[in-house]
Design a protein with these regions (language model features):
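C-terminal nucleotide
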Residues: 2-18, 23, 31, 39-86, ...
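DPxDG-like acidic metal-binding loop motif
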Residues: 34, 117-142
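Short glycine/threonine-rich catalytic loop with a Thr-x-Gly-x-Asp
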Residues: 119-123, 284-290
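Short pre-catalytic strand/loop immediately N-terminal to key active-site residues, enriched for Gly-Thr
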Residues: 110-117, 282-284
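Alpha-helical scaffolds flanking conserved acidic
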Residues: 107, 145
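Residues that flank catalytic or metal-binding motifs in active/ligand-binding sites
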Residues: 13, 36, 291
Length: 332
């Protein structure tokens, strides 16, 4: 069944406020959707092809009636867009009969999410693509979209907890537990942060493996760190609800020290976190996988302009004001 020939959807980026890496092993994390988004349009075309175009410069096409395998004779563009192709193929094959499957889908992607700095651009693109393509054929609820987006994202990050896709789908501040009961955290006012992009690229896969090796070699220590991370998350959820930025900032800095112990931070990141604290931030920590990437700082509202200027003067890093937004996936 075809509902419409053209569909659009957008999904937000995210920041991890607390609990990255530990969430993979069952500890909670707190994530928030932010005011940066990926926008996807999908339309029915007559050739039985899946065509994917991105404003990052990648363009690739696949045949609908063939499920390609990742890594087998694919061009660089096809490898880059493979998770989106996989998600689209799954939606089409589950929505159409054999006759209708002779149709194809053309997908256009536009993003204002910086890539590769820990903001969940991969998850957001999967969520928006599944939503846009799915809406061509049937009305789909958010849980259906989340499940298929996470399946596609795991082709990129095999150990993904699902947190990125979940917060991108449902929006807001989420207390997230892998395979557990998740809940939204209600706040009295919007939470805003300064995100500092170090420009240092990282491999999420390599960092996840590093943490896995650390856990295997230091089981007792890892368990202690995970328990501390859980306690920090629980206290942070209370601080967010109570609108207590001083307490929240201290908890952010404690979380960063746990990540230092895991070995996923870098000297540049640690120096940046210390400078943020010395410059008046309530708290600061790396966000995402680590290995460079980005730092988030919680800064008094009246000091944000001066804070950003000082950081730019000291490090020349890109400073991005971000705000936690209550809305996640949007369909048009």
């Amino acid at each position: 069944m075809i509902l419409t020939s053209l569909s659009r959807a957008s999904a937000p980026a995210k920041v991890v406020l607390f609990g990255e890496h530990f969430v993979v092993y069952g500890s909670p994390a707190i994530l928030g959707s932010i005011d940066r988004r990926i926008r996807v349009s999908a339309q029915i075309i007559r050739p039985p092809q899946i065509i994917i175009r991105s404003d990052t410069g990648f363009s690739a096409s696949f045949t609908v009636n063939k499920l390609y395998e990742c890594g087998t004779n694919l061009s660089e563009a096809q490898k880059f867009t493979y998770p989106l192709y996989f998600a689209t193929h799954e939606v089409i094959s589950g929505s159409l009969n054999a006759k209708a499957a002779k149709l194809g889908v053309e997908i256009d992607i536009h993003s204002d999410i910086p890539y590769g700095i820990g903001l969940g651009s991969s998850a957001a693109s999967c969520v928006a693509t599944v939503a846009a393509v799915g809406s061509l054929f049937l009305k789909r609820d958010r849980h259906w979209i989340f499940t298929r987006a996470h399946r596609a994202e795991r082709l990129i990050h095999k150990s993904s907890s699902g947190g990125d896709c979940y917060v991108s789908t449902f929006g807001g501040l989420i207390y997230y537990v892998r395979n557990g009961k998740n809940r939204k955290i209600k706040t009295r006012r919007s939470v805003s942060l300064i995100l500092v992009n170090t420009g240092i690229k990282h491999s999420t896969k390599a960092l996840v493996s590093l943490v896995e090796n650390f856990r295997n070699q230091n089981t007792s220590l890892f368990d202690d760190l995970a328990n501390s991370a859980t306690h920090i998350c629980d206290q942070a959820a209370l601080a967010l609800t109570e609108d207590n930025p001083v307490k929240l900032g201290r908890l952010m800095s404690r979380n960063h020290r746990l990540l230092e112990t895991l070995g996923v931070s870098t000297e540049e990141t640690d120096n940046l976190v210390r400078y943020c604290l010395d410059s008046g931030a309530y708290g600061a920590k790396l966000t995402g996988a680590g290995g460079g990437g980005s730092v988030i700082a919680l800064v008094p509202d009246e000091y944000k302009t001066e804070f950003g200027y000082k950081l730019l003067k000291k490090y020349s890093y890109q400073c991005i004001p971000v705000q936690i937004r209550s809305y996640g996936l949007l369909k048009y």
